[in-house]
Amino acid sequence: MLKNNGDIAPALEKAMAGEELTYHDGVQLMNEENLFLLGAVADKIRGNLNGNTVTFVSSYYLNYTNICVASCPLCAFYRKGNEADAYTLTPEQIAAKAGIAVKQLGATELHIVGGFHPKLGLDYYENMIRAIKSEYPNITVKALTPAEIFFIARLTKNSVKEVLLRLKNAGLDALPGGGAEIFDTETRDIVVRGKCSAEEWLETTRLAHELGLKSNCTMLFGHIEKPEHVVAHILKLRELHKKTKGFTTFIPLKFSLDNTELERKGIVTRESTPIYDLRVIAVSRLLLANVINNISVYWVAMGKKLAQVALAYGGNDMVGTAFSEEIFKAAGKNTGTSIQELTNLIKEIKRDPAQRDTFFNVIRKFS
């Protein structure tokens, strides 16, 4: 164990000793000057929990509509409905895309999200899932964030539980963890418009977990949040997971600035630095140690090279191939990569690549 010689933060000592970190500890670590030491401790804990393996899933990202009533300032993807590039896919079109994912790309997971469409009933989502499952029963359908579920419930005048039950009966396997953004109310009110509150997101997720629907969890960082908001957000996720055991991984999502209202209005003028990004990954690992085992590095937003570095700062998962990812593409990010490229990126840093399923069961190792 590291000896406290006055240069090592007490919170790092606690982390090395396996103690659960507090809010105060997290804030201290978000301000820790020695980034290398912070990363080294996070990497040590990552190794204790996950060994040398870095996982990823073969995932096809499918956006069923870009029409959204929310118009969040952080988003470059949404359309109001009268634009030339506004679209809504039919269940049949979605099933056809699922065929491409399975037959041509070897995807084991469909990651399906979209905008808050004001005219789609619950039957649309049920039919979408059934259309996929009738043709490809073995693919995992990970669809509709807690924010979308909450919106659908409000729109269709159903309870959140009823919406979740009907979608599960239609074949829904899991939920993506988007829509969490940042939980701090004041910050959330600036970067989010027309979306559920933090409490509503957490309660929707809790209900999903109670019904046996697992999910990942996320946090959007690198906009106007403060270090203490990052810590508080992560700790709320930690507390929920202690109750439900429903999160498969935590995915810190780096904010992509281009083409957003936050950029146009000058609220955010530049993206976060690599140093800040690595700090968030490392602190996430330390705060969630022994609670949520997996920390995913979302290379689509972070970039492949920085993602490799983040795997030495507490990350143990690269999320997935992200075939046909549209939301970050709208914000100027290059999306989509092959299984071979991901394995090569992992091997370059002397780690062991492994393909997983949605629920973190390893299904293929690469020598």
Language model features: what each stretch is:
Residues 1-36, 96, 102-103, 235, ...:
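Auxiliary Fe-S-binding modules of radical SAM enzymes
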